[in-house]
Amino acid sequence: MTDHPIKYRLIKQEKHTGARLGEIITPHGTFPTPMFMPVGTQATVKTQSPEELKEMGSGIILSNTYHLWLRPGDELIAKAGGLHKFMNWDQAILTDSGGFQVYSLADSRNITEEGVTFKNHLNGAKMFLSPEKAISIQNNLGSDIMMSFDECPQFYQPYDYVKKSIERTSRWAERGLNAHRRPHDQGLFGIVQGAGFEDLRRQSARDLVSMDFPGYSIGGLAVGETHDEMNAVLDFTVPMLPNDKPRYLMGVGAPDSLIDAVIRGVDMFDCVLPTRIARNGTCMTSQGRLVVKNAKFAEDFTPLDPNCDCYTCKNYTRAYIRHLLKADETFGIRLTSYHNLYFLVNLMKDVRQAIMDDNLLEFRQDFMERYGYGMNNRNF
């Protein structure tokens, strides 16, 4: 067995579910799990400073390989001393492989055994990304946790296509492992794919587990499938993954999905959802979603969430934040973004306490009722 730079320590398993309380040890510090990771696409979490992220309890953030490769370039970031120094963040960083962005943003994709040729979304230039190149970029970035290059097939793709895709993704994972230049200080995760097909998810997981990655990601979810379909995939995928390694569900940030994935044994999550909806004035609160731009809040001098102790809620009113957003003032977006990130990071803190107290199912029921999920199952 390899001595990996990323280690998982299980502290407690909840009595009634598969939920795990633990911590992940990285070269840039240790963070508790389950954990929600804010997304810093362009080496910044939109409108937030590193100090604010630490203040809210983010022990790790995510950055995007594809975007940083295109701009400003991974070699420039390496010259700066790596991503941590470049963005002045001294805690853990996870980078994705660039695969999802190639499939979702780029034009004219052509997938072969070698990799993917595509036109980049900034200037239309033809580019090529292979498993080896994705690893090389991430080695230059110097993230603590890296992702294997994978194909992310759509959830409802035909079985035969998905089968070929996961087999290629497994071969790509092995190529990425062989290309990894910094296994002593960067942990590379394998990504389980397989759309909604149980046998293909199991095959993908078996292939990757045999390669002894320091952690495993579950990809290809939160791409249009229903909440129940996501839970079903987790039900048959998570048990295939080792108990002594971290489990990361990619691209998931809706509160109900976070809680239900924790119940099934997932440790890490990321999503642009909290900052994206914040820019439109949509706020997550303990009583459900609140669209602070709405006219009814024009003279509402209460906090976004009376039960929240974040900087935004302790200092500013709905009326003021609404005014800022209506006037296109950046400070308004800073305040709503901070609040939403704080909400999800601290939801995970509350979930960790519920695991410690062995009452996660009761916590889930109470949260769902207060948040309004009975009326609308995808009420972000």
Swiss-Prot record:
Task: List the molecular function annotations (GO) for this entry.
Answer: metal ion binding; tRNA-guanosine(34) queuine transglycosylase activity
Q: Which InterPro entries match?
A: ArchSynthase1/Queuine_TRR, TGT, TGT-like_sf, tRNA_ribo_trans-like
Q: Where is this region: RNA binding?
A: 251-257, 275-279
Tell me what reaction this enzyme catalyses. Answer: 7-aminomethyl-7-carbaguanine + guanosine(34) in tRNA = 7-aminomethyl-7-carbaguanosine(34) in tRNA + guanine
Superkingdom as given in the UniProt entry: Bacteria
EC class: transferase
Keyword Zinc belongs to the record: yes
Q: What GO terms describe the biological role, i.e. biological process, of this protein? A: queuosine biosynthetic process; tRNA wobble guanine modification; tRNA-guanine transglycosylation
Query: How is the cofactor bound, in the record's words?
Result: Binds 1 zinc ion per subunit.
Q: Which SUPFAM superfamilies match?
A: tRNA-guanine transglycosylase
Assigned GO CC terms: cytosol
| Protein purpose | Catalyzes the base-exchange of a guanine (G) residue with the queuine precursor 7-aminomethyl-7-deazaguanine (PreQ1) at position 34 (anticodon wobble position) in tRNAs with GU(N) anticodons (tRNA-Asp, -Asn, -His and -Tyr). Catalysis occurs through a double-displacement mechanism. The nucleophile active site attacks the C1' of nucleotide 34 to detach the guanine base from the RNA, forming a covalent enzyme-RNA intermediate. The proton acceptor active site deprotonates the incoming PreQ1, allowing a nucleophilic attack on the C1' of the ribose to form the product.
The name this protein goes by in its record: Queuine tRNA-ribosyltransferase
> What's the encoding gene here?
tgt
